[in-house]
Amino acid sequence: MIFPIWKKCLIQLQIKLSPVEFSLWILPLKVTIKNNIIYIYTPNLFIFRWIKKKYVNIFKKILYKICSNNPPKIIINIEKKKLEKKKCIYKKKNIQIYLHSEINKKYQFHNFIQGQSNQLAYYSSYKFTKNLKNFYNPLFLYGNTGLGKTHLLHAIGNKFLIKNKKKKVIYIHSENFIQNMVNSLKNNSIDKFKNYYRSIDVLLLDDIQFFSNKKKSQEELFNTFNTLFNKQQKIVLTADCYPEYISGITEQLKSRFKWGLTISINPPELKTRIKILLHKAYENKILLSYEVAKYIAKKIFSNVRELEGILKKIQILSILNKEKITINLVKKILNKIKKKKKNINIIYIQKIVAKYFNIRISDMISQKRSQSIVHPRQIAMTLAKKLTHYSFSEIGTAFGKKDHTTVLYAYKKINQLKKKKTEIYSDFIYLFNQLNA
């Protein structure tokens, strides 16, 4: 729901700010109004600090113009759910350390949009829940970001729980599995950790590539895998590429990943993209005609997540501009969004970053380790991951045949700098905004 006062404020902000600023900092905010107080909720701490520093005074000035007689007070908080999760992660003793194990009920088989690109993955996932003892185990799904791997993991979990609510069905992202193990070692509770994960009925482990070059974590995963497999418990794994091509993973683990059935999920074809858009429009009560959905689907083709993001932008801007969603409106919006982004590929990103830092592309893709080269290289790798559909392995290849783990390390390092006000992260944000404008 968009409150009338906040809607007026958004219109003024849209005029005052650049499209990049508006979509990057304002659109993610959630707002409620009570007793003449506007409660603004940010999705994370970084945006919270940025809004307080850069935009609170702008909000106040606009609201004073809108309701000069009695302007509302503004209170900014981090969205409650996110805050609670963050607190839980750092609690130590006597607290359940195994987080992120809940299955998301939103993701079911019935609302997974099937098409030629994902039909085999869908069928295999559904068949996996039939609980046939001799059926393929593990099931390994791989493909680029935003194609539905996580949706299928949760759908599998939900199906098992519908059959038997007492089953111990655990969904967890690989990074959280690793973090839980580290916390257990720190808290001298590693036996508890082992007992927990080795007593699972169904393990749904997302983004297995995050185990890359983590020797102890891989040992624990190896032992957990063997225990569950020998007990004929179910295992489903996902990754961004075929098991054989995940660098930094032991051959023992790779061979086990391939013991069952390995299925790829590909980017959706045109018909599936249209179906996804119409389904998402129906779910979100957006009036979207088939012709408009087809037009969008022809322009956006990388993944489901991008389709959803574009649809949300179109919905918000149609509300703000009080216009129906027509092909002409969509053309205007897509032209703005895609003006620079349409030509974005890894080579283009390398050119822009090299020019910004006044270095040569040949240096960026070389083996040079000086800070003047390493930082631009890490920024360029992270931009490539965020702004293109390429996997870590493919990005590594484009940067002088570097290992998948080098790209993963760069990506994590740049993202960790969000918490610190560093010059490197400022450079990254500036370049991201320039490329994504």
UniProtKB/Swiss-Prot annotation:
Residues 102-318 are annotated as: Domain III, AAA+ region. Residues 1-82 are annotated as: Domain I, interacts with DnaA modulators. GO terms for biological process: DNA replication initiation; regulation of DNA replication. Keywords: ATP-binding, Cytoplasm, DNA replication, DNA-binding, Lipid-binding, Nucleotide-binding. Residues 82-101 are annotated as: Domain II. It is found in: Cytoplasm. GO terms for cellular component: cytoplasm; plasma membrane. SUPFAM superfamilies: P-loop containing nucleoside triphosphate hydrolases, TrpR-like. Residues 319-437 are annotated as: Domain IV, binds dsDNA. ATP binds at residues 146, 148-150. InterPro entries: AAA+_ATPase, Chromosome_initiator_DnaA, Chromosome_initiator_DnaA-like, Chromosome_initiator_DnaA_CS, DnaA_C, DnaA_dom, DnaA_N_dom, DnaA_N_sf. NCBIfam families: DnaA. Oligomerizes as a right-handed, spiral filament on DNA at oriC. Plays an essential role in the initiation and regulation of chromosomal replication. ATP-DnaA binds to the origin of replication (oriC) to initiate formation of the DNA replication initiation complex once per cell cycle. Binds the DnaA box (a 9 base pair repeat at the origin) and separates the double-stranded (ds)DNA. Forms a right-handed helical filament on oriC DNA; dsDNA binds to the exterior of the filament while single-stranded (ss)DNA is stabiized in the filament's interior. HAMAP family: DnaA_bact. This is Chromosomal replication initiator protein DnaA. It comes from Buchnera aphidicola subsp. Cinara cedri (strain Cc).
